[in-house]
A protein has these predicted regions:
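A beta-rich soluble binding module of mature secreted/lumenal proteins
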Residues: 1-207
């Protein structure tokens, strides 16, 4: 194989990590286009994610808000359940954009959390594996997200899990998503409290 390096003076050979070989293989590029998945009207459920980022969170779901075919703009909603004595539901809107550098790269922007970059390591009509950019210093190396479409939640998707193991950090959490796991969970009350209203007036500039 051309990617295996051996020398006559040594009885050993050097093999690159499988992920490195696959990501550079032109035959694999066709499996790294995330946009058919991200523009799908199906609800998407997060199955795997970095343990560090998903503490006390479950049932992460993304729904399509808008897909403009002419401009390529994609907007989705992402909601999740905060685990506690009284579970509550939060949500944010996310703008998704591609980059000129590569079709596999995705930038996600929110007003609450700013912008974050991802690189697609695998995508098909059933699942999507996104690796969080290595420029994100707060997440472990090779951290990934595995998203699954709602119709395939009960499918083992062994190939998706296998590729996640090949490309991604094994220190992950399995959210074990179930269809409609968001039903019956109250939305987080974001209304300001009476104390908050009183405090907010103390910093007003004089008129």
């Amino acid at each position: 194989y051309p990617f295996v390096k051996c020398t006559l003076s040594s009885s050993s050979c050097e093999c690159p990590a499988p992920e490195t070989f696959l990501l550079q293989d032109p035959n694999y590029f066709g499996f790294r286009d995330p946009w058919p998945f991200l523009t799908s009207p199906d609800r998407l459920y997060l199955k795997y994610g970095p343990l560090k980022l998903l503490e006390n969170i479950q049932c992460i779901i993304s729904g399509l808000i808008k897909y403009d075919r002419s401009s390529g703009d994609v907007e989705r909603n992402v909601s999740w359940t905060n685990i506690g004595e009284q579970p509550s539901r939060e949500s944010i809107n996310v703008d998704l954009e591609g980059t000129k550098k590569s079709k596999s790269e995705v930038t996600a922007t929110t007003t609450r959390f700013g912008s974050h970059d991802f690189n697609t390591v695998y995508s098909d009509p059933r699942c999507l594996v996104l690796r969080i950019s290595q420029t994100e210093k707060k997440v472990p190396f090779r951290s990934c997200l595995l998203w699954v479409k709602e119709p395939f939640l009960k499918n083992p998707l062994r190939h998706c899990r296998f590729l996640f193991d090949v490309f991604c950090n094994w220190n992950r959490v399995d959210l074990k998503p179930a269809k409609d796991c968001d039903k019956g969970v109250e939305k987080k009350d974001e209304r300001p409290t009476r104390a908050g209203n009183q405090n907010s007036g103390t910093n007003r500039p004089p008129r």
